[in-house]
């Protein structure tokens, strides 16, 4: 097998047991405690596919996005791009991270420098990371603007002169200027009007087909996720509780938390009715999580081991679920 063939068989992006713990002290003499914002998350992202990461605010999904782009460094775990270790502190790994993994932020009003024109915003990554001439940078910026539906005359305008949807198109174009393979999309449409969300989503899907992009799509909106995802990872308090294909998650959710999230999602078909599952209480504090399963205080299927032990992901026909109740359903004799 050639080196190229071996590379193509590897996941494009692979995370193994990624962790991010923040030390916290409440007073000068208080003992240091840890907030486990991310606590052992693993996944494989294949070329040209979209992995959606979903969950309530505070579940750790945005922290995961920051780790994947090295905005923050993980406390532990491993991260590979086509088999190459991205956590090595060497110039080659850093260059690879900058060029091959880019991010599109949630807020198009805050992520663009108001003092710079669109052309300057788009050319800045090229100015920092390439040796292209001024004319070459301009040519590439105009080409990318056309790809995202912006006009040539927009090149010399400032961000405040655009609508929210147009600003997010600028942000997407900026994220693609270095020809990345992976784009981390952190709630890319949540700050937009409903009327333009579908346009931006369709643009992202068209760009994925045209450029062969892979997305890690972070969202709390399952109706949006259903439109764009190939695989879905459900997170709760820093951990993955369920992972599977889009069809598995939406048609046969196994974890009680996933079931509750989906029951709250509006359906287009009025005949497609689900039992409304109402969760009691709020997301626990990551500074003081409950013993056992972090979801046990809100779970309607809680029983003995849920309050004592932390469930691990188990494979049920290709669908990974971390739940003692599901395990009991599959193995009632235990």
UniProtKB/Swiss-Prot annotation:
Q: Which Gene3D superfamilies match?
A: P-loop containing nucleotide triphosphate hydrolases (3.40.50.300)
What the entry lists under PROSITE patterns is as follows: ABC_TRANSPORTER_1 (PS00211), ABC_TRANSPORTER_2 (PS50893)
Q: Which GO terms describe its biological process?
A: dipeptide transport; heme transmembrane transport; protein transport; response to radiation
Q: Where is each ABC transporter domain found?
A: 13-262
Q: Name one Pfam family in it.
A: oligo_HPY
Report the EC number(s), separated by commas if there are several: 7.4.2.9
Q: What class of enzyme is it?
A: translocase
Where does the record place it? Answer: Cell inner membrane
What InterPro entries does its record include? AAA+_ATPase (IPR003593), ABC_transp_ATP-bind (IPR050319), ABC_transporter-like_ATP-bd (IPR003439), ABC_transporter-like_CS (IPR017871), DppF (IPR050021), Oligopep_ABC_C (IPR013563), P-loop_NTPase (IPR027417)
Q: How does it sit in the membrane?
A: Peripheral membrane protein
Primary localization class, coarse: membrane
Q: GO MF annotations for this entry?
A: ATP binding; ATP hydrolysis activity; dipeptide transmembrane transporter activity; heme transmembrane transporter activity
Similarity field? Belongs to the ABC transporter superfamily.
Its quaternary structure?
A: The complex is composed of two ATP-binding proteins (DppD and DppF), two transmembrane proteins (DppB and DppC) and a solute-binding protein (DppA). MppA can replace DppA as binding protein for heme and ALA transport.
Q: What does this protein do?
A: Part of the ABC transporter DppABCDF involved in dipeptide transport. Responsible for energy coupling to the transport system.
Q: What is the protein name for this chain?
A: Dipeptide transport ATP-binding protein DppF
Q: Which organism is it from?
A: Escherichia coli (strain K12)
């Amino acid at each position: 097998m050639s080196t190229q063939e071996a590379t193509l068989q590897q996941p494009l992006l692979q995370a193994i047991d990624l962790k991010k713990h923040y030390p916290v002290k409440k007073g000068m003499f208080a003992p240091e405690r840890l907030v486990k914002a991310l606590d052992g998350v693993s996944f494989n992202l294949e070329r040209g596919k979209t992995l959606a990461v979903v969950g309530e605010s505070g579940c750790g999904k945005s922290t995961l996005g920051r780790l994947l782009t090295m905005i923050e460094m993980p406390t532990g775990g491993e991260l590979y791009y086509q088999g190459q270790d991205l956590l090595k502190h060497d110039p080659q790994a850093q260059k690879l991270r900058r060029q091959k993994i880019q991010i599109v932020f949630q807020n198009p009003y805050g992520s663009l420098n108001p003092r710079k024109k669109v052309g300057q915003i788009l050319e800045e990554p090229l100015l920092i990371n390439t040796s292209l001439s001024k004319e070459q940078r301009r040519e590439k910026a105009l080409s990318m603007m056309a790809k995202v539906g912006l006009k040539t005359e927009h090149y010399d305008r400032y961000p405040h002169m655009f609508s929210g949807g147009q600003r997010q198109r600028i942000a997407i174009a900026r994220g693609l200027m270095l020809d990345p393979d992976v784009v981390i999309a952190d709630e890319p449409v949540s700050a937009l009007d409903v009327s333009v969300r579908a346009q931006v989503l369709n643009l992202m899907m068209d760009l994925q087909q045209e450029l062969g992009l892979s997305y890690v799509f972070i969202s709390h909106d399952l109706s949006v996720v259903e439109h764009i995802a190939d695989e879905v990872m459900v997170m709760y308090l820093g951990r993955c509780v369920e992972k599977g294909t889009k069809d598995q998650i939406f048609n046969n959710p196994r974890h009680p938390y996933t079931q509750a999230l989906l029951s709250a999602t509006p359906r287009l078909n009025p005949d497609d009715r689900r039992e409304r599952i109402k969760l009691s209480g709020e997301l626990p504090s990551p500074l003081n999580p409950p013993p056992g399963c972090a979801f046990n205080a809100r779970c309607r299927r809680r029983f003995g081991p849920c309050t004592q032990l932390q469930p691990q992901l188990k494979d049920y026909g290709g669908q990974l679920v971390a739940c003692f109740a599901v395990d009991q359903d599959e193995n009632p004799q235990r």
